[in-house]
Amino acid sequence: MPTPHNNAAKGDFAKTVLMPGDPLRAKFIAETFLTEPKLVNNVRGVQGYTGTYKGVPVSVMASGMGIPSIGIYSYELYTQYDVENIIRVGSAGAMRADLELGSVVAGQGACTNSSFADQYELGGAYAPICDFDLLMAAVESARELGVKMPVGNLYSSDTFYDAAGRNMRYAKMGVMAVEMEAAGLYCTAAYTGKRALAICSISDNLITGEELSADDRQTTFTNMMKIGLEAAVKMAQD
């Protein structure tokens, strides 16, 4: 059932979708890791693919940048395409000096400066968290792959350029890294009764000033991708 943002047919998406922000990263994941990937969506250049990984159907589709964008795509996948699990595989800026470029973190929770959750009229501050089963599948996968993956709080910012200098205030509260989508994804999963997890690779470090190139961000975050794919396999076995 196509939507204004997705021209895939019902049944074109697997139960688990890996969701990078970048359409080129979605293409890279599909062509590098999936067997017989099929392009199922290309509206607005937001490419979506479905194939298999180790015999398990898996889809990958870009979310675009920011909470409003991932809010649209995740909601439609959950409600129109019967997707059960969305694993965000994106980049993040480290708020700890010990997080090296290319290292992987998982967001157990995601605080935000966004008003996205206001739509639910909860009357308070909602704390978006990931799905525990998805998180454990990712943690086990990371251990099996020999990849160190700290688990903690992410900060989903509505702004990329931090004009007011507020990002580092979150670092003082133990937040590991800043990105722009996880909180919206977690809220949408909670509202629809589905599962979500954000796994992020460190593209730059706000403490040290180090950063990766745009090309490296598209194609070198393979540990994050493998963890997401292995987690998808584990979820299919449960």
Features from the language model and the residues they span:
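Generic non-transmembrane alpha-helical segments
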Residues: A137-L145, T188, I227-M235
